[in-house]
């Protein structure tokens, strides 16, 4: 969410004071969402349904960077993969919340042709990606991490 948005500020304040953030504050907010046929959007829709949050006002895009840019301009809240936090444009205008929900887990695969020699650069990429994602160092870039209903 945008740092100037009241709902985002309420969520951040709950995190700062050690209270569980009430996602119900998002109920009447605008959202910048990915089109529903995109896999991440399907996961977000499932999450919102489980949290009983009805989206009444949404702008749709195919691109997460566009969603972040629009959120930075306070056009609404968006959902992005955790790794998007690191490279987010207009980082200073945004508040990031790691919701740590199984509904939002988005698998990542590296696919290459079987029985082919993997080039050293490709192997280095796979190893670097695995180390980065397993280290969860990206989590430190979130403004608030909610783990099993408790702010961390």
Task: Identify the role of each PLM range.
Residues 5-7, 32, 77, 95, ...:
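Residues embedded in well-ordered beta-strands
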Residues 37-96:
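Hydrophobic hinge/microswitch elements
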Residues 1-2, 7-12, 108-118:
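A bilobed periplasmic-binding-protein/Venus flytrap-type ligand-binding module shared by bacterial periplasmic
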Residues 1, 35, 98-100, 114:
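Residues at the C-termini of beta-strands that transition into short coil/loop
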Residues 15-23, 27-51, 118-127, 133-144:
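Secondary-structure junction motif
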Residues 50, 82-91, 101-152:
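C-terminal effector-binding regulatory domain of bacterial HTH transcription factors
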Residues 1-6, 15-18, 145-148:
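Low-complexity basic/metal-binding stretches
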């Amino acid at each position: 969410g945008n740092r100037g948005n009241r709902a985002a500020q309420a969520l951040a304040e709950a995190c700062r004071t050690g209270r569980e953030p009430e996602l119900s504050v998002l109920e009447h907010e605008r959202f910048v969402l990915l089109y529903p046929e995109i896999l991440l959007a399907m996961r977000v829709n499932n999450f919102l349904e489980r949290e009983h949050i009805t989206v009444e006002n949404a702008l749709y895009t195919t691109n997460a960077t566009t969603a972040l840019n629009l959120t930075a301009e306070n056009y609404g809240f968006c959902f992005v993969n955790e790794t998007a936090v690191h490279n987010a444009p207009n980082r200073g205008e945004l508040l990031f919340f790691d919701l740590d929900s199984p509904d939002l887990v988005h698998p990542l695969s590296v696919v290459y042709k079987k029985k082919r020699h993997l080039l050293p650069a490709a192997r280095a990429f796979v190893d670097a990606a695995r180390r980065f994602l397993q280290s969860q160092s990206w989590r430190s870039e979130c403004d608030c991490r909610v783990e099993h209903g408790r702010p961390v």
